[in-house]
């Protein structure tokens, strides 16, 4: 029983299919599987994990699902071709015309676009609330509200959500509580244990951990995942077996990587707070963070994500980034290498400027995904780049 094993052991062993005695799950680069009588019966009965066709399931996707469920403490799950495919399937699979959702005003840019541009076309309306104030979520609930949507940490301003308080509100009003746990990974927080119904991941990020795949995952109860399975099949956002293999490989080192990501980010945040070229430093480990107390309760191990505001605005921030030699200017996060971006010209490019500013993405705002390099090399790189502004 994997639930009896400790987290690090689950990251290595859960889900691995030792076919033909292989230490790792072999890559089954096949679009289809032999349709035996047993599999045909399972398919006809609607069994979601029957190996028939790789858009439905594959050996490699099943191995990943089992591991993620073991790490999140979930009953079941599905794998997707991207994080947005996972989020879209949850929204369109569990909501219908006339339903209402309450979500965070500073939700991830891709999710914001889905909620403001696509869902209304299907008659699904979204009210944006303040993730830092659970009472604002409760105040936004309507008679037709079906779901509360939250993120463990907001992107990119790193607000910490009081997941337990949100779970209390969701339970009180009999609503689904859906959370994007990408920014902390299962190593950093356990939303299902705190009362969430569905946990979403962009597996591109910390779970994959090497910036070499794009993927998504949804885990939760057997009943909810069973509702989502036919939607996944209909929408077609299935992952490739080779990408699944790389994801499983990446997850095996999750418990080794995450402590370094987090300790590096905490140390650099502490030093940036004292740097004369930095206006504001944002990291949940800092006592100056407005959600410090909540963070210590919800995600005490921290995160490898870091944000700060460079004095001089966006032009100064861009000059700083272009002078970096180790930290790589690129979108995404959660890989072993450090990545940096200005949200105004990347993740939040298509969010109106007043909305960005209200969410805390002010001129000079920089987001960094701190990798597992030596912290002193990272700090020297940051220092020399700031010195050249």
Where are these regions (language model features)?
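N-terminal "arm"/small-domain region of PLP-dependent enzymes with the aminotransferase-like
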Residues: 1-58, 66
């Amino acid at each position: 029983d994997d639930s009896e094993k400790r987290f690090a052991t689950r990251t290595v062993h859960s889900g691995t299919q030792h076919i033909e005695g292989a230490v790792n799950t072999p890559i089954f680069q096949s679009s289809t599987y032999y349709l035996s009588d047993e599999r045909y019966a399972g398919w006809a009965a609607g069994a979601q994990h029957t190996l028939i066709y790789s858009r439905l399931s594959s050996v490699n996707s099943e191995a990943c699902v089992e591991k993620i469920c073991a790490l999140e403490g979930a009953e079941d799950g599905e794998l997707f071709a991207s994080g947005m495919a996972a989020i879209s399937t949850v929204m369109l699979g569990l909501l219908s015309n006339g339903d209402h959702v309450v979500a965070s005003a500073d939700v991830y840019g891709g999710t914001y676009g889905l909620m403001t541009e696509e869902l209304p076309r299907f008659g699904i309306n979204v009210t944006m609330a303040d993730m830092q104030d659970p009472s604002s979520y409760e105040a936004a609930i309507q008679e037709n509200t079906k779901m509360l949507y939250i993120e463990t940490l907001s992107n990119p301003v790193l607000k910490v959500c009081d997941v337990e308080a949100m779970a209390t509100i969701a339970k009180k009003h009999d609503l689904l509580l859906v959370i994007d746990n990408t920014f902390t990974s299962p190593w950093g927080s356990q939303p299902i244990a705190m009362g969430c119904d569905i946990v979403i991941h962009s597996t591109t990020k910390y779970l994959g951990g090497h910036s070499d795949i794009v993927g998504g995952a949804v885990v939760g109860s057997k009943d909810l995942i069973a509702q989502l399975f036919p939607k996944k099949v209909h929408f077609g956002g299935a992952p490739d077996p080779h990408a699944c293999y790389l994801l499983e490989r990446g997850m095996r080192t999750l418990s080794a990587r995450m402590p370094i990501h987090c300790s590096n980010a905490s140390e650099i945040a502490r030093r940036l707070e004292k740097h004369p070229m930095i206006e504001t430093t944002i990291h949940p480990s800092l006592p100056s963070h407005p959600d410090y107390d909540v963070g210590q309760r919800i995600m005490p191990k921290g995160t490898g994500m870091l944000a700060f505001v460079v004095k001089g605005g966006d032009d100064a921030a861009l000059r700083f980034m272009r002078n970096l030699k180790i930290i790589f200017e690129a979108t995404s996060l959660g890989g072993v290498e450090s990545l940096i971006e200005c949200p105004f010209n990347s993740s939040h490019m298509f969010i109106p400027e007043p909305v960005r500013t209200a969410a805390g993405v002010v001129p000079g705002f920089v987001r960094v995904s701190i990798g597992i390099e030596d912290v002193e090399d990272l700090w020297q790189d940051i220092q020399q780049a700031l010195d050249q502004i």
